[in-house]
């Protein structure tokens, strides 16, 4: 919950400062792993690979910033773990100007493959966040996706206690000392300026009651002004 509320505030401030920016929702995956040791190494490799990829010239030249969250899900058929990143990417409008600036899905796949030093084509999804959604701001939807819990207990709990303990042990080892939420670029600067604490290490004692009131009163509604070609925050 806390990450979602903080992210809403950061995105709202970005839009106020740079109303012409555009947004992408990126999902990056690699092959599944089967135990805690493999999971821990894979998550470390992904964090390093992501940093490398965001420095590639074609990506970096239009990059304003990003918000990244790592999620782990479990395949109940083979008991493997799927680790993937959800990334809300903020780019300059020039990103969509021409082929010299625009990064298509095939290129995202190749960039991620190169950054991760993989010998296979990974599954990468990239979605342009549309200016307006009939029922809900697409930006809010993307924030909700990146703000999900890294692992849901309903994903790994079964009727088999031994299996549950094994999964819990794997996840504890796999997630040990891993930063699952991070900001970059302008979003990181704004997160710091707003004095938002670390969602992984900050004050969690007062989260439920204090943040619930905040959540009720702060849901980002980013509307698109078609004449000015920019976003504005609807009060």
From Swiss-Prot:
Query: Record's InterPro entries?
Result: Rep
UniProt KW Amino-acid biosynthesis keyword: no
Which UniProt keywords are listed? DNA replication, Plasmid
Q: Does the keyword Secreted apply?
A: no
Gene Ontology molecular function: any one: DNA binding
Q: Name one GO biological process term.
A: DNA replication
> What positions does the entry give for DNA binding?
149
The UniProt similarity line reads:
Belongs to the Gram-positive plasmids replication protein type 1 family.
Its biological purpose is as follows: Produces a single-strand nick in a specific site of the plasmid, and this nick results in single-strand replication by rolling circle mechanism.
Q: What is this protein called?
A: Replication protein
Gene of origin? repB
């Amino acid at each position: 919950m806390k990450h979602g509320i903080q992210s809403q505030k950061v995105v709202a401030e970005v839009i106020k400062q740079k109303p012409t920016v555009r947004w992408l929702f990126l999902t990056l995956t690699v092959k599944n792993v089967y135990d805690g040791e493999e999971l821990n190494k894979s998550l470390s490799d992904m964090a390093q690979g992501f940093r490398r990829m965001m420095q590639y010239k074609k990506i970096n030249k239009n990059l304003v910033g990003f918000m990244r969250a790592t999620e782990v899900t479990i395949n109940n058929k083979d008991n493997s773990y799927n680790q993937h990143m959800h990334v809300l990417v903020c780019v300059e409008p020039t990103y969509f100007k021409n082929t010299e600036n625009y990064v298509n899905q095939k290129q995202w796949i190749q960039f991620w493959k190169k950054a991760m030093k993989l010998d296979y084509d990974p599954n990468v999804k990239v979605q342009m966040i549309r200016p307006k959604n009939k029922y809900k701001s697409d930006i809010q939807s993307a924030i909700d996706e990146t703000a999900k819990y890294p692992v849901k207990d309903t994903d790994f709990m079964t009727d088999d206690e031994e299996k549950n303990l094994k999964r819990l042990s794997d996840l504890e080892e796999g997630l040990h000392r891993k930063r699952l939420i991070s900001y970059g670029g302008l979003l990181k600067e704004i997160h710091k300026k707003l004095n938002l604490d670390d969602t992984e290490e900050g004050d969690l004692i007062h989260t439920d009651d204090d943040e619930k009131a905040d959540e009720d009163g702060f849901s980002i509604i980013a509307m698109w002004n078609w004449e000015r070609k920019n976003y504005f925050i609807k009060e």
